[in-house]
């Protein structure tokens, strides 16, 4: 799906990757704005795929907010059902104080709380895209983000 581009909007593509046995992960965010393309990336040991997906989105939002002024609109495209599904779970997670049914703290509660705060403060629209799908766009940014994140993980675990 090619996003309709509004000059006041930032288009963001994110992805996270994790080597499940070695628990090393990486995240990538590609930010498009007025013809510019900015790529952010990072990595962490002892992590999970969900944490990397969430960090990609949070870091993209924070980058845009820290480098602009005034009203911003972010259109975020991700293949992570986990990230896209979080806003629908906000009320339940908040009322249970981010605890699971067994009374343990929700995994990644720190990031989930930060994510919810960012959603409250800014105009953010999340779009679920299918992973590894070809598009008619000149550059498939979702696939590019995936390749970059997987490349970081591969290089680190060799």
Locations of regions flagged by a protein language model:
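RNase H-like nuclease fold core
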Residues: 1-52, 62-64, 87, 140, ...
């Amino acid at each position: 799906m090619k996003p309709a581009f509004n000059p006041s909007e930032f288009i963001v593509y994110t992805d996270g990757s994790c080597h499940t046995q070695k628990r090393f992960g990486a995240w990538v965010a590609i930010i498009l704005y007025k013809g510019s393309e900015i790529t952010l990336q990072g990595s962490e040991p002892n992590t999970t795929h969900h944490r990397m997906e969430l960090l990609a989105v949070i870091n993209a939002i924070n980058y845009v907010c820290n480098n602009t002024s005034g009203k911003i609109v972010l259109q975020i495209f991700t293949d992570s059902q986990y990230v896209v599904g979080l806003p629908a779970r906000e009320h339940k997670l908040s009322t249970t104080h981010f605890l699971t049914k067994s009374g343990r703290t929700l995994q990644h509660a720190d990031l989930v709380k930060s994510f919810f705060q960012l959603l409250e403060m800014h105009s953010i629209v999340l779009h679920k895209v299918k992973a590894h799908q070809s598009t008619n766009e000149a550059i498939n940014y979702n696939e590019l983000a995936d390749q970059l994140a997987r490349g970081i993980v591969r290089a680190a675990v060799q």
